Amino acid sequence: MSAKTKVKTKKSRNSKVPASLVWFEIPADDIKRARKFYSSLFGWKIKAFPNMEDYWHIDSGGAHASPDRAIMKKMCPEHPVTNYILVDSVTRASAKVEKLGGKVHKAKTAVPNLGYFAICQDTENNVFALWEKIESAK
């Protein structure tokens, strides 16, 4: 790797590097069936996410397993798996998505006590999400 392309990052054992895949959601028509499928296939422990209807957290190996994941109620027949990518600022990254020809379908939204996200679409019509971890989010 040349000096120009080498990227140095500082992170603790428990932190994620910006641009890392940090979360994904699996949409399901039948959550019970999806829970059974994935827990049987991979041994994932799947539990209801606090204060969220039809949203289930998947534990695939403890607190430091990465990326984190969830099963949720499918919102439409074409609902894709959504990958959440860590960014320093959802606001700045959303603006950059649009500048580069992508679209922001759901603007910056708070997940109380966890952070902010935005749902975007790239130039090839792939859906993805931006994630900014801020525990003071309201």
Model-inferred region functions:
Residues 2-35, 64, 81-83, 132-138:
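N-terminal beta-strand motif that seeds the catalytic metal site of vicinal oxygen chelate
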Residues 49-54, 110-113, 137-138:
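Short glycine/proline-centered loop/turn elements that form peptide/ligand docking sites
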Residues 21-29, 73-99, 116-121:
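Vicinal oxygen chelate
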Residues 4, 44-80, 123, 127-133:
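Conserved short beta-strand elements that form part of the metal-binding/catalytic scaffold
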Residues 34-38, 97, 125:
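Conserved active-site tyrosine of GNAT-family acetyltransferases
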Residues 40-46, 101-103:
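Conserved acetyl-CoA-binding loop of GNAT-fold acetyltransferases
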